[in-house]
Amino acid sequence: MSTNKDKIEQSLALLEEVRKDTGQNPIHNYQYREIMHREVLKQYLPTIERSVGGHGADAVTSTLKNIELKSSTWDRKSDPTIDTWKPIMFDMSKLKDSTKIYDYQALGHGLWTRTGAYPIANFFIGPNHIKKLHPLFKKLVDEYDTNTGRQDTTFTIKDILNYMDKQDIIWFKNGQRVRGV
């Protein structure tokens, strides 16, 4: 019978193989989610790859240099819907952090179960539509309070849909492109 120590060592050995393949430690700050998010997005963005460095863009393509990929944990048994989709969180603890959202050329968000490699659902807003979110970003930045410490701000897919049509968003379910959630 395997002990917890044995299971962890086996897991860490496999995770080290992923680190060697991707250049990212998959368990640091949920990096495995970025790795798998990029893998799913290759259906739509064949040249997507990891951006170099731990700050700034999460991914790049041959034409996009600032793709932001966000993730959340999905603990429900049911599939996510527009109404139940988890909020997207941004750290706005520094003013420069709060304004860098205007520089995003694309935005993705995925929902992961605690044991799933692929997101059970994710979406991607590309360069033709991301600027439609600037009024939402302005609202978030205007609410920024420089006197507090770490300040997270969230918005939902319903908030996004106040600024763009559902068909402006690329949707995926269990790693496959779909028409919507």
Regions found by a protein language model. Name each.
Residues 1-181:
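Nucleic-acid endonuclease domains
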